[in-house]
């Protein structure tokens, strides 16, 4: 969670790095995914930090509006305080994430992904360096290890706590060890 201005700067820089962007600020036209991530991070920061009075309230409402606006425009339903830094959203398109989900650093997510809770009201927890392919569905109180690659169209409804593996299928199953990329 973003608690300080230093955290906010770190998150913004790492998100920009994950998107492969070298410019200082977004273009007036385009860069909508980057603009969404900036609005998401400012909204997180202003929601998590107490104090500031009316000015902070107005700023929080403004960034909350931008977060919501870009989310609707791009098809994203990504709540605050779910993703750690290094979020990379690859394409416009439907991405739905439950507010209870927790996703680690350097997550790479594609279009048409759904990360939701199950009937028992538990949501997924993903480790760092995860890659989630287009159309993947993750639900329930599952835990996914670090460096896991989830194939396109996979349905993940059980935990995979091993690190650096590839899982695919309906329901998902491990197909290989990918090795540590670092």
What would you call each of these model-derived segments?
Residues 1-74, 180-182:
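Terminal amphipathic alpha-helical/low-complexity segments used for targeting or macromolecular assembly
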Residues 73-81:
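Charged/polar, low-hydrophobicity segments characteristic of intrinsically disordered regions
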Residues 80, 85-86, 90-99, 104-105, ...:
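Left-handed beta-helix
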């Amino acid at each position: 969670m973003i608690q300080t201005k230093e955290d906010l700067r770190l998150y913004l820089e790492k998100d920009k790095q994950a998107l492969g962007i070298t410019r200082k600020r977004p273009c007036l036209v385009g860069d909508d995914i980057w603009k969404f991530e900036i609005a998401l991070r400012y909204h997180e920061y202003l929601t998590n930090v107490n104090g500031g009075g009316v000015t902070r309230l107005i700023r929080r409402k403004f960034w909350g509006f931008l977060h919501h606006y870009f989310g609707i425009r791009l098809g994203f339903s990504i709540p605050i305080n779910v993703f750690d830094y290094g979020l990379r959203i690859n394409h416009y398109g439907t991405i739905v994430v439950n507010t209870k989900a927790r996703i680690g650093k350097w997550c790479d997510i594609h279009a048409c992904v759904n990360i939701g809770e199950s009937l028992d009201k538990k949501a997924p927890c993903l480790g760092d360096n995860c890659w989630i392919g287009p159309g993947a569905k993750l639900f329930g109180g599952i835990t996914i290890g670090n460096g896991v690659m989830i194939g396109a169209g996979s349905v993940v409804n059980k935990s995979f706590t091993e690190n650096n593996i590839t899982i695919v299928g309906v329901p998902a199953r491990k197909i290989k060890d990918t090795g540590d990329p670092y």
